[in-house]
A protein has these predicted regions:
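Glycan-recognition and catalytic cores of secretory/periplasmic carbohydrate-active enzymes
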Residues: 1-107
């Protein structure tokens, strides 16, 4: 995700991006992913295990779709295109209201 920050904020931005790339993205790829439904879990506990699902939200799926699509072509992120495609299919499969148009907020 190329961003052109002001030099005053660059250290903070770099810290956030490092945290995101080194912790958050791997969690979303591993324990934060429900492979059976091909959907992201809403939350993980302190030990990085999924909390029992109460629901799955379209926005959580769309957020991760955006993130993984943004990582396509980045060095070391060869997984991004496959995950973005899976999330796009899941968004359409689970949340699109084909009968009335639009989208379901959650399932």
């Amino acid at each position: 995700m190329p961003i052109a920050p002001s030099s005053a904020h660059k250290p903070q931005l770099n810290a956030v991006l490092t945290h995101f790339n080194d912790l958050i993205v791997p969690l979303w790829q591993g324990p934060g992913w429900n492979a059976e439904l091909a959907l992201p879990y809403e939350a993980l506990d302190a030990d990085h295990r999924p909390l029992p699902p109460q629901r799955y939200r379209a926005m959580a799926c769309a957020r991760q779709l955006y993130v993984f699509a943004s990582l396509i072509g980045e060095p070391g992120k060869a997984f991004a295109q496959e995950r973005a495609a899976a999330l796009f299919r899941s968004l359409q499969r689970h949340f699109h209201d084909a009968e009335h148009g639009g989208w379901f907020y959650s399932i």
